[in-house]
Amino acid sequence: MTKLVEIEGIGEKYASKLEGADIKNLEALLQKGSTKKGRKELEDASGISGKLLLRWINMADLFRVKGIGEQYSDLLEAAGVDTVPELAQRKPENLHGKMVEVNEAKNLVRATPSLSAVEKWVAEAKELPRVVTY
């Protein structure tokens, strides 16, 4: 079970609000927040905006791809990829180049992932079933 605070932006305050809505980990957040109805229920129960919840749910979805954790999900988001279906549509070479460019400008991670890692992410994203509906 992955802790809520693994997602950028979910600090102790928001984690506490989510736990009050019976969301104890990222897997529960992804499961409950995968539908519009579930996100609305979460918004009502936690008092957290739907937009912010969706951002976190998309990041939790990216965590399903092996090798993408807190740091790389932030870098992917900064490079314009914030969902698994979006990752699946990307050309690995172009995405890798964009990630290097973004990281040089923003210094989000110590080491950018290798091209082979990005290729594996894109391939895995193509195989993963869609979980989040919009």
Predicted features and spans:
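C-terminal extensions
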Residues: M1-Y134
